[in-house]
């Protein structure tokens, strides 16, 4: 299973313009 914290980390660093909340929503 994809680790949520790791997903958020990669989302924040890899997806331009995404906020923490948006990454959290996408990753959970």
Curated annotation (Swiss-Prot):
Role description: In vivo, intracranial injection elicits scratching and grooming activity in mice, and causes body and rear limb extension and tail curling immediately upon injection.
Keywords attached to this entry: Disulfide bond, Neurotoxin, Secreted, Toxin
Protein family according to the UniProt entry: Belongs to the conotoxin L superfamily.
Tissue: Expressed by the venom duct.
Disulfide bond residue pairs: 7-27, 11-23
Domain notes: The cysteine framework is XIV (C-C-C-C).
Highest taxon above the source species: Eukaryota
Localisation per UniProt entry: Secreted
Transmembrane parts of this sequence: none
Coiled-coil ranges (or none): none
Protein name as catalogued: Conotoxin as14b
GO CC annotations, alphabetized: extracellular region
Any GO molecular function: toxin activity
């Amino acid at each position: 299973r994809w680790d949520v914290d790791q997903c958020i980390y990669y989302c924040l660093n890899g997806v331009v313009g995404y906020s923490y909340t948006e990454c959290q929503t996408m990753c959970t």
